[in-house]
């Protein structure tokens, strides 16, 4: 069998485009490979945020949405948008899974525990959804309603949780029932890399009421964390309990409703709470028999718990479609973005298609990635170059995590190093592509590293941007890329390069016109 000449899609996570040079790590970095590509190869800018990717207008994109949209080849109305609509039209308040969980607690005089990232970020959750759930639980008659608030500071400014916690306190005060029971930073509660020591911290504060710190109110607890030098993301577990109140923990027979809608960072804490065969850490004697645990969306196919908003069918995604045509494909990324090039790219589907290989390169075990901005890019590149030169694959999808993961630190110098590490990787990968006469498309799922400081807040800009991202065609063939595209147009463009017809389910458009 003759060697295949692959089409390689390189997703440079968090690598946005900005004309503004100030606080722009892409501009500050030494990027000879990228600079040459931008000068000599067909290129354009594409949208990754708002309505272009099925999000509310003006809402920044994120890795889940970006990879889902790329793989689907169409605009996919995201969970955020679906839940917003259900709240506005009232369906949220009659959602059968939420109703069952709340009514069970009421009937059995048990508590309703609401978990989630309390944030305006809109990436993993939105605080308005948590406030709506508090209202729903109390208005249905629940007498014990507790919010376990995970704090953001990553998809929001580093110290922005006070307004969110104050509003939660105000909502409870107005309803006359319930309170915030604990706070903890997302660094602990929403890990996705099997760092179970972190997850245990969040588990313990909710289940055993054990934590290093306590406070009378959530805002007091946050202020104490700031005094200790902790930003929202890193706030240590704090029990919130007034002078005349008992510590509110998750107990046998209680209902737990997890309001995060993005799956990847919700899985570990969910497994710790409900998995009978859990081995991540010793849960001790106190592990509760939760009567009802509700996932707002499906966190994983093997998590057996009711789902309030089940996944919508995304048939004929890129991976499924080319597998059906007998083509071979590879997905490759380091741990932090592996789910994105597999689960999310396949439309929220865990299946591995015929002819689909996967390579997972472990992310480095460091506390934060600014300590190692190159992350595992060299190792990913080693494996990717080998795969390109193997002649086995028709299509290869690769994610480089650096610019997003280091961009979230808000540390400019580290972000510059991340950009430079990706540029070195690009040079090696494109040399391999050229060697086998393959083709490459280079893009990003959203911006981040091109906007590292927020002059409005006076704080580092740790969240994603709403700026466009590059889309570059690298080939021995000549061509032109159309303007005005979005991530929904990436898969149709790859199919055109592979000389494959576009399935009717893909409503994105091919952006490339080949010459000659």
Swiss-Prot record:
- Disulphide connectivity of cysteines: none
Q: Which GO terms describe its molecular function?
A: manganese ion binding; phosphoglycerate mutase activity
The UniProt catalytic activity note for this protein reads: (2R)-2-phosphoglycerate = (2R)-3-phosphoglycerate
Q: Please give the pathway this protein is involved in.
A: Carbohydrate degradation; glycolysis; pyruvate from D-glyceraldehyde 3-phosphate: step 3/5
**What does this protein's record comment on cofactor binding?**
Binds 2 manganese ions per subunit.
GO terms of biological process kind: glucose catabolic process; glycolytic process
Which CDD domains does the UniProt entry name for this protein? iPGM
Q: Where are the coiled-coil regions?
A: none
Q: Which cofactor does it need?
A: Mn(2+)
Active site as annotated: 63
Q: Which GO terms describe its cellular component?
A: cytosol
SUPFAM superfamilies the record matches: 2,3-Bisphosphoglycerate-independent phosphoglycerate mutase, substrate-binding domain, Alkaline phosphatase-like
Which UniProt keywords are listed? Glycolysis, Isomerase, Manganese, Metal-binding
Residues given in the record as Mn(2+) 2 binding sites? 13, 63, 445-446
Q: What does this protein do?
A: Catalyzes the interconversion of 2-phosphoglycerate and 3-phosphoglycerate.
List, alphabetically, the NCBIfam families matched: pgm_bpd_ind
Its assembly, as annotated, is: Monomer.
Q: Report the protein name in the record.
A: 2,3-bisphosphoglycerate-independent phosphoglycerate mutase
Q: What is the lineage of its organism?
A: Bacteria, Pseudomonadati, Pseudomonadota, Gammaproteobacteria, Cellvibrionales
